[in-house]
UniProtKB/Swiss-Prot annotation:
GO biological process terms on file: cell redox homeostasis; response to oxidative stress
Organism of origin: Bacillus subtilis (strain 168)
Protein name from the UniProt record: Monothiol bacilliredoxin BrxC
NCBIfam families membership: B_thiol_YtxJ
Pfam families given in the database record: BrxC
Annotated keywords: Oxidoreductase, Redox-active center
Single annotated GO MF: oxidoreductase activity
Amino acid sequence: MAKQLIQSEEEFKRIAEQEGVFVFLKHSTTCPISQAAFHEFDAFANQHEDVPAYYLQVQEARPLSNFIAETYGVKHESPQIFIIQNGEVKWHTSHSQITEAAIEQHLS
């Protein structure tokens, strides 16, 4: 599965209610650190097409970003990545800690 842009709470809720695991990235389109994190996320998604991968652009979907922070009790940061499994945050991190290797490590 290719990575998919999510823009609404309804889309996110539909994904989060499903069984299994998925990766979710919140990023800024104007921040160089965020662009580097997106590159790592993109590399992961391209190498692991069996793992659903979603993202949002904070500037265009701030209400969704806030909803995710409130739902999971994780303070908003950007960039920020989550591994969510069966409705629970299995792992999250932000900024330069977002690497393809880190995502792979925490997925297993």
